Amino acid sequence: MAAAAASASQDELNQLERVFLRLGHAETDEQLQNIISKFLPPVLLKLSSTQEGVRKKVMELLVHLNKRIKSRPKIQLPVETLLVQYQDPAAVSFVTNFTIIYVKMGYPRLPVEKQCELAPTLLTAMEGKPQPQQDSLMHLLIPTLFHMKYPVESSKSASPFNLAEKPKTVQLLLDFMLDVLLMPYGYVLNESQSRQNSSSAQGSSSNSGGGSGIPQPPPGMSFYAAKRVIGDNPWTPEQLEQCKLGIVKFIEAEQVPELEAVLHLVIASSDTRHSVATAADLELKSKQSLIDWNNPAIINKMYKVYLGDIPLKTKEGAVLKPELKRDPVSTRVKLKIVPHLLRSRQAAETFPANIQVVYDGLFGTNTNSKLRTLSLQFVHHICITCPEIKIKPLGPMLLNGLTKLINEYKEDPKLLSMAYSAVGKLSSRMPHLFTKDIALVQQLFEALCKEEPETRLAIQEALSMMVGAYSTLEGAQRTLMEALVASYLIKPEVQVRQVAVKFASTVFPSDHIPSRYLLLLAAGDPREEVHGEAQRVLRCLPGRNRKESTSEQMPSFPEMVYYIQEKASHRMKTPVKYMTGTTVLPFNPAAFGEIVLYLRMCLAHSAGVVPTSQSLADMQDHAPAIGRYIRTLMSSGQMAPSSSNKSGETNPVQIYIGLLQQLLAGVGGLPVMYCLLEAVSVYPEKLATKFVDKTEWIKSLMNNSKEEMRELAALFYSVVVSTVSGNELKSMIEQLIKTTKDNHSPEIQHGSLLALGFTVGRYLAKKKMRMSEQQDLERNADTLPDQEELIQSATETIGSFLDSTSPLLAIAACTALGEIGRNGPLPIPSEGSGFTKLHLVESLLSRIPSSKETNKMKERAIQTLGYFPVGDGDFPHQKLLLQGLMDSVEAKQIELQFTIGEAITSAAIGTSSVAARDAWQMTEEEYTPPAGAKVNDVVPWVLDVILNKHIISPNPHVRQAACIWLLSLVRKLSTHKEVKSHLKEIQSAFVSVLSENDELSQDVASKGLGLVYELGNEQDQQELVSTLVETLMTGKRVKHEVSGETVVFQGGALGKTPDGQGLSTYKELCSLASDLSQPDLVYKFMNLANHHAMWNSRKGAAFGFNVIATRAGEQLAPFLPQLVPRLYRYQFDPNLGIRQAMTSIWNALVTDKSMVDKYLKEILQDLVKNLTSNMWRVRESSCLALNDLLRGRPLDDIIDKLPEIWETLFRVQDDIKESVRKAAELALKTLSKVCVKMCDPAKGAAGQRTIAALLPCLLDKGMMSTVTEVRALSINTLVKISKSAGAMLKPHAPKLIPALLESLSVLEPQVLNYLSLRATEQEKAAMDSARLSAAKSSPMMETINMCLQYLDVSVLGELVPRLCELIRSGVGLGTKGGCASVIVSLTTQCPQDLTPYSGKLMSALLSGLTDRNSVIQKSCAFAMGHLVRTSRDSSTEKLLQKLNGWYMEKEEPIYKTSCALTIHAIGRYSPDVLKNHAKEVLPLAFLGMHEIADEEKSEKEECNLWTEVWQENVPGSFGGIRLYLQELITITQKALQSQSWKMKAQGAIAMASIAKQTSSLVPPYLGMILTALLQGLAGRTWAGKEELLKAIACVVTACSAELEKSVPNQPSTNEILQAVLKECSKENVKYKIVAISCAADILKATKEDRFQEFSNIVIPLIKKNSLESSGVRTTKNEEENEKEKELQLEYLLGAFESLGKAWPRNAETQRCYRQELCKLMCERLKLSTWKVQLGVLQSMNAFFQGLMLLEEEHADPEALAEILLETCKSITYSLENKTYSSVRTEALSVIELLLKKLEESKQWECLTSECRVLLIESLATMEPDSRPELQEKAALLKKTLENLE
């Protein structure tokens, strides 16, 4: 054994020595490279030898080699082989360690293209190797990435790096790439430099312990990372830039998962080199929408890179090695990372990294203002998005950081603003952090005072956000806050005061008196933003009902009054008091005004009514209640606290009145005047008496410049005066009469007039009251006559001003008379001359229609008229007055009609009217007429006039007015027996007005109907309902119509189209009520519907319909389940009237927002049902309602309804009406969005159910729809669902994919098919290619590709049969091309799973291969090329046999094309499969290469395909033929035996090619080929048969030596010649030409003498042609003559050439034919065209070359002399041919040959002197030849001839 080992070792050493020797002998680089390529890999393998000597020898050799290589950088190493060797799992580590050295050395030397080619191998080689070696390989790979070419469409099959199955390698590569991207340019790893030395440059994180000896790495890297990137050969900055660009390109090409590479792009985008940063930025932007920034993997990586390896307290032994510890990245990179963190919710939640990033950005050593700004943005982001649980631990740290920044950093106002804003946001998220820290509030207030203007806004915003945190303060904290707010309310900065107001209004409860006081002071602020906010807060009313408003909502009136009084008295002693003229006020007027209004609100609130300060009229409604409260306060004797008891007044009411008086005296003001009037009027007995001595002051108020002020003052005066009696009263009235008549000042007259009227009125009221209370006639009789006269005088004085030229005084007189008349009979005569009651009535009535009068005058005149019968039970002109009021309607005066309505009501009922009450002390409801009052009720008469005359008037304005009066009567006199007894007539009247075109008329009528219904008893109500329903729904006339001649419904208003107004709204309401089986509900609906703006006015509000509506809403509540669906739809009705009405009802009924969700199913059912209603209006409203319903609510419960909704909307999308179509489109778009959201995988089972429900509908109905918009939306939805649903699509793929494939053709514009049919073949192919390309990039294909990602064996079983069916029977280019594309994708997505189905798919694709459309054919071939990779061998064999059969047997070009395309595709995409079946494929390819190409057809392209297949898969053509010779001969034989002539010819060409390329064929193949070819020759001539002849000639020429041997089954030369010569006798001229040429070639090759037979065929034809060409022209047309000439020419040329070739070396034969042949040639030389001359000369050259007479041993001087003479005579023609140089050239060659031969045979004497002279003369003519070489040659030959003489 030892001996054997020694021997083997010696052999190895000897081998190594020989290699050494060869290396030594290598002189050139090329030689050295060849030796290295051959021997380096095996030499390295010797390192695994067990023999020390061998290993030593190898090392010596390698040392020598290294020296040689290093000095020669161009020498290439066998890197590919070395990489294979390196990957060998059996190789020992010693070998691999050395192998990688040479890989590292050789790889960078390779051309770039080769490096790119080997790049994937480098990656593969890394698997399982030691870390340093992996680093080395990556160092080689990274520079190559820049040069790599990636496919445009990324797919796994086309990807150069197939990384899907190598997750570990991917991770290694990504880590290395990240380090490369982090590496700064020009960085040098200085071993002497320690980390600690550069701590200042590294920021907060470089303080890493225990690494003092390790050099400082670049930011973001560890020492180890830097070292491995630098490697053995550090990159220059330019190379590093290229590497980084290469990495970005690599990521762009999607070679690694997008998720993994996000961080790399972010890092690259921060690069200092523009090219890298721009490329990365662009890529990041393009992927922005695809990246999930909430993915924890991405965010954690970003944090890790940003922060580096932070030393945390870890378990023992878990501390990171110093050289592996990564530093944080540079500020530049941080600036790129943080913006991406800002996109991420996950980043905000990740603790503790989020807070570390914040602190690093704000306070890190290396931070800058940009980073600080971004960090603050991140704080904002955390505050907004971080969930409650996760923000809790962050709060204190964030707050500390922000306060620290605010305190320390003052340079950048913008930054400070952000910091303050962040504090505000933090407070709104975590109020508990701030609640106890009032110092922070103070700090911010102070900052607001002192900071720059641009920062103040942020502080203001922050403080506003912080307010909520302090709303629960109590005790000392609250007091502290009060003081704080109070101190800042007086600061000069407006923002400070504004925020202080915010704090005062929000921090404290609304009944907190000190804060309200502060707000009241703020309400007097000069700046609008401050006082506006304060007023808004103060006037914000408590809840409308007592349930809502608790007693705490406003301060109690007494307490608030005392507080104000205390503050006022205190302020009067300080400089803050306000001086105005001679008056001193405790507050400025604005604040004081707000204070008294607020006190009035507190008073109202304490009195139990809703406080309001908006309208004096509204305030007066509450006077009786306030009066009761004031009486209580006055009688309870409530006193002020002792501290405030300094002004003398102790009762809160008195203090309140004192404050009002003070303000009124100092500044005045209408609201203040009203408040004082109200306070006194409600309790005059106690309070008015105090003002008796202040009548002069009151009079001064009556002289105020403002009319309203004078009116209120006059009222006040009358209240005060009414408390006095006797002479005092008399003198006051006389004084008033006097001032009234004094016309110096209209204002004084106006005030006095009003005061006089009000005073007389109050006097009469008191008189009436005394009479009713005491019934004391005697006392009554005691009334002083002079008082009565005075009252009459006063009344007449007032009356005299009715005709005043001043409207002001006329109105005042009218008002005053009204007041007198309201309270008692007018003290003037009824009739007669002068100022009488009749005159007064007529005067006032005449003013109402007058255009000269103002509206105010008219209003007052109407009111006054209405009051006369109220105060006077015996008023004589009551009916005249009422008739006058009703007849005064002219134009449309709505407001006036409401006033007339009120007046008619009051006048009709007379003394029983509520107008008779004292409005200050009694409400309408509380009033009852005095028992003894005389009844003057004319309601029956009024009702009769309105119903029988005015409501049926032809004038629409009169009808409207009558309706309003009727409504007023019904509302105000609801209990009147006359109204109750005429309910049906009144209803009929209201119904008749419903059809008016005027909206208000309709609304008034509908409100009236509601009131009428409420008034009836049960039986009445039933009758009213049935009548109303019948009238509304049928349009029949009402039975209670008064006048048979008057039409109730004017102008065909009933039954108008829905677009019109008319009754449609009420019909709908009636229909709605009927559907609920509750017809009476129509009245409730009417009350809720059409809430006209009029009802919000003072006049309208008096009817109290808001209350009625609320009650109606409550009564309808039980019907909500039936109502909600209908009402929901009606809100979207196209008819504006119906829509508004129904929306009003909806708003009244549906107060709970969750109601829609509660009744979702019912609403949906109603909408879907009505989508196909026969009324367009209903269809449109259903679509719009559905659009609204679907948005923003969970639809999990109605998934099963979705298909029905889709399908119904699809139908509506094709509606006849455009507005309906648009509504349907809107609904469909919303439905699409909702469905896409519901198909999200996060929805779980609901998502699955949604997809299962939707897909059939979208595929079958949507995509197949004839409506373009429906199809487009369906596809769009499917695409979005596929993106959203992801893996959930898998179960539905078998249905989805085929449907989408079908749609590729269905959805294509049909015009393309038309154009395709009309186009040429070339145009058609180009167009179809473009169509298929468009289909492949369509949304449908995008969806299909999405689905394909998730396919596996579980769904393929169902999908494949459908796919096969579609391939076979699918219609359309797009569908078939798409199917092929899907199959290709399947082969790459799930190759193993596809194997069982590949056979079926192949079978289906075969039908596509024979498709007439070339584009489909190519697509199917392409698919087949991929599919064979996954199929079983048996299937592949069957396919190849099928293709072989098609090619050999089918004559149609389509079959041949499909074979070429398929085989080519298999070769390109599944080369391994082709190699496994090479024996079947390559012979066919060889045969295919030799197809005879038709000019017009695509055979040329097919030949190229076959050629490519052949060349790609054989080791050189010669090697291929040798390898597959048997198969090639078999297939060519089969081709020759084919019935197709074309195939026979193709077989022949292939055979010829075999013979040519092998140079020699050996038995038995030669015999087989020749036999087959000769068999083919037998029989008639056919197109292409020439190829057989050419093949025979070719084979014989190539194998002439083999043919000399006699071999069984191999035809002899004689047999071959016999067969070919036989073909020369065929009639077909073209064929004959080829046959003669081939026969000549064979004769030449075999040197056989068959000249006799050959010349017998050829020479007669030459002679015949000569005769024909010189003969008479035939009658054939020019073209035929031309063709015949060409054929003759071709024949002559061929014949002469053949004669030259067939000229034998046989003395006897030559003797027989030399003379004849020479003569023939000479003749043709003289007579022919230049082409024939050229051919003859060439033939002559061959003739003389083989002429034995020119050889010494066969000399015959005489015969030769004769031949030469003949020749010389004829050749002179050619030599002298001046036109064609080619003829002259060939002629010179012949003479040169002759002279050379004569010289060699020494037979000069045979060239006679005659010949020489002829030749010399002809050669002399060439001396001036244009071509120098001919000139020279001619001169040389001439000289030779001359020398002979």
From Swiss-Prot:
Gene3D superfamilies: Leucine-rich Repeat Variant (1.25.10.10)
Any GO CC annotation of this UniProt entry: late endosome
Record's compositionally biased regions (Low complexity): 193-207
Modified residues (N-acetylalanine): 2
Protein keywords: Acetylation, Cytoplasm, Cytoplasmic vesicle, Cytoskeleton, Endoplasmic reticulum, Endosome, Isopeptide bond, Nucleus, Phosphoprotein, Proteasome, Repeat, Ubl conjugation
InterPro entries, alphabetized: ARM-like (IPR011989), ARM-type_fold (IPR016024), ARM_ECM29 (IPR055444), Ecm29_N (IPR024372), HEAT_ECM29 (IPR055443)
Renumbered ranges of HEAT repeats: 28-65, 107-144, 162-205, 326-362, 387-426, 429-466, 469-507, 683-720, 721-759, 783-820, 829-868, 870-907, 931-969, 975-1012, 1013-1050, 1112-1149, 1152-1189, 1194-1231, 1243-1281, 1285-1323, 1348-1386, 1390-1427, 1517-1554, 1558-1595, 1605-1642, 1646-1683, 1779-1822
Sequence segments annotated as region (Disordered): 193-217
Superkingdom of origin: Eukaryota
SUPFAM superfamilies attached to this UniProt entry: ARM repeat
Positions of post-translational Phosphoserine modification: 830
Modified-residue entries (Phosphothreonine), positions: 836
Cross-link (Glycyl lysine isopeptide (Lys-Gly) (interchain with G-Cter in SUMO1)): 1039
Locations listed in the record: Endoplasmic reticulum; Endoplasmic reticulum-Golgi intermediate compartment; Endosome; Cytoplasm, Cytoskeleton, Microtubule organizing center, Centrosome
GO MF, one annotated term: proteasome binding
UniProt xrefs under Pfam families: ARM_ECM29, ARM_ECM29_C, ECM29_N, HEAT_ECM29, Vac14_Fab1_bd
Segment forming the signal sequence: none
One annotated GO biological process: proteasome assembly
Family that this chain belongs to: Belongs to the ECM29 family.
Function: Adapter/scaffolding protein that binds to the 26S proteasome, motor proteins and other compartment specific proteins. May couple the proteasome to different compartments including endosome, endoplasmic reticulum and centrosome. May play a role in ERAD and other enhanced proteolysis. Promotes proteasome dissociation under oxidative stress.
Subunit field text: Non-stoichiometric component of the proteasome; associates with the 26S proteasome. Interacts (via N-terminus) with VPS11, VPS26A, VPS36, RAB11FIP4 and RABEP1. Interacts (via C-terminus) with DCTN1, DCTN2, KIF5B, MYH7, MYH10, MYO10 and ARF6.
Protein's UniProt name: Proteasome adapter and scaffold protein ECM29
Organism: Homo sapiens (Human)
Lineage, broadest ranks: Eukaryota, Metazoa, Chordata, Craniata, Vertebrata
